[in-house]
Amino acid sequence: GLVKVNGKVIKSNYKVKLNDKIVVTEKEVVEADIKPENLNLDIYYEDEDVAVVYKPKGMVVHPSPGHYSGTLVNGLMYQIKDLSGINGEIRPGIVHRIDKDTSGLLMVAKNDVAHRHLVEQLMSKTVKRKYTALVHGNIPHDYGTIDAPIGRNKNDRQSMAVVDDGKEAVTHFNVLEHFKDYTLIECQLETGRTHQIRVHMKYIGYPLVGDPKYGPKKTLDIDGQALHAGIIGFEHPVTHEYIEKHATLPNDFEKLLDDIRRRDA
């Protein structure tokens, strides 16, 4: 509703006509005062250019309206301090993101040169990003690739979906363990679209356990989707050495698997 033509809010596909009166209202930008906070983040690797940090489940990556404290950025500002500035004041050091209720590892850039190199690696699809996920249903094959474009859900702008005019999205997966009603899988991202694994697994009929947005109603004792970014691998932006870090499953995910194994026994 920020653009009006002849006093009326118009749709994005409106074609401007001669003598139309166009009024654009500038959105008020609130400069948030983002403060460093001691959140005791686990840092898996750090040197003068890059860091690999663990984001626990339930933590937002960067500040946004209503979330100005307790974010990964607040913790990074306290523990790392030197962070790249390319993404602005509310996203220092942030090269890529994972969802609030997904746990796991993220690359962090400590200067702009490192930031650009890491982004280039993401764009050229050379960063290794592997996730562990628990899905509903029993996947009959041992591995597969989902190549389906993702964009905004036309019926619900707050969620994503596989859509014809979406951006390229490719997810590779392989089965780690079969259960009676569930399958434990490892997913490797070739692209990094919003909610990619969650949308793709729903698309092929195996939605993530606990997913409040794309899954069925809650049936197991876990808050949020059972998804963990356990492996990150990339080339160091300065030394060009290969760095790969692994993070074990969080306790709630491990407990969930143990409960299912006991139930199936």
Region locations from a protein language model:
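RNA pseudouridine synthases
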Residues: 1-265
